[in-house]
Amino acid sequence: MNRTFALFISLFLSMTLYSQIHEVGIFLGGSNYIGDVGPTTYITPSEPAFGILYKWNKSPRHAYRFSYTQSKITSNDLDSKEPSRSQRGYRFENSIKEVSLGLEFNFFDFDLHQLERKITPYVYSGISYFRYDELYVVSGETRTEERANSFAIPMIVGIKSNITPSLILALEVGTRYSITDNLDGSNPKSERLKPLQFGNINNNDWYVFSGLTLTYTFGKKPCYCAE
């Protein structure tokens, strides 16, 4: 993913030429998966996740956001309350490396040049592109066929506040609806592996990143006016 970091640096340098305020920071949290293997709990961070992010604030209500996040996702049928899954006993492990670009919207004005303490809920969506392992299951054992790429639709909700004049702390939960049904090995793409399909092949898999972001703000005071 060296090209991802090069893209991040290029975007960062180009945006600093403008007068809007910027944010750059880190994400720390956990990940979980929702699909055809293991429990169906929606928010159960079970593996560490980390990332970097950049925001270009165009107004007190909205910002363009770019991020890179990576994590491992795992699940085990033995942790499921569904008898059919717990008896089956499948488990898997996959690696997710994601870049995402989209729009973040604040429910309340969040003018970073006003020094008083501010707090606001926010939502984010856009498009994500990620790398993962194409898996398949044979004789109860999960194997890797190849490294693959896919898209996902991120849907993030969170709440944030400025803890100092230059630092913003946020808590967020972000689900990703992936355009693949094979994060878990249940629906391999290869024709020769189609007989190994299991589960509901009409529903795609989801993965979730939950955690904290800490961003540093900088840039000239903007004019929030119609362009």
What residue ranges belong to the model's regions?
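Gram-negative (and chloroplast) outer-membrane scaffold detector with strong preference
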Residues: 60-62, 66-137, 216-218
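Predominantly the C-terminal beta-signal and adjacent terminal strand-loop region
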Residues: 78, 163-227
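Residues that define the transmembrane beta-barrel architecture of outer-membrane proteins
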Residues: 44-48, 95-99, 119, 145-153, ...
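Bacterial Sec-dependent N-terminal signal peptides
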Residues: 1-27, 218, 227
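Residues on the lipid-exposed face of transmembrane beta-strands in outer-membrane beta-barrel proteins
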Residues: 26, 52-56, 101-105, 125-127, ...
